[in-house]
UniProtKB/Swiss-Prot annotation:
GO biological process: regulation of DNA-templated transcription; viral life cycle
Assigned protein family: Belongs to the baculoviridae LEF-11 family.
One Pfam family here: Baculo_LEF-11
Signal peptide: none
UniProt-recorded name of the protein: Late expression factor 11
Keywords tagged on the record: Transcription, Transcription regulation
Role played: Involved in late/very late gene activation.
Length: 118
């Protein structure tokens, strides 16, 4: 593969590994659709709970139940990102028990080797 091909991207590789990348937008869409579906079904208990609230556990349980069949529509209707492949990543996102500042500091240290940024 030429350097230019690598910079631009390899279309076949991108299509082959499209399910390998879970974006923040995908997680947001999953949570938003979970809320919409639960409201549609008349399940209003803790529907507005934040991810750090205890009530968000009901959202997580609903997502866990549906994850094996859940998908996100990507660039066209024929391409869907199957979320069951990302179960571990989704669980780790939902189990963050820190403030945003603590999470930022942790990521900065992990990826940049930076000292604690307070």
């Amino acid at each position: 593969m030429s350097k230019k091909e690598n910079i631009i991207g390899n279309k076949n590789r991108t299509q082959k590994y499209n399910n390998a990348c879970l974006t923040r937008s995908d997680v947001y869409a999953l949570v938003k659709e979970t809320i919409n579906k639960r409201k549609h079904d008349g399940e209003f208990c803790n529907i507005t709970a934040h991810i750090f609230d205890e009530g968000f556990e009901q959202q997580k349980e609903y997502i866990r139940e549906k994850l094996s069949t859940a998908s996100i529509v990507t660039d066209c209707r024929q391409n869907r990102k199957r979320l069951a492949l990302h179960r571990k990543k989704i669980e780790s996102i939902f189990n963050i028990h820190t403030s945003l500042q603590e999470e930022f500091n942790s990521c900065s240290r992990r990826y940049n080797g930076s000292p604690n940024l307070e």
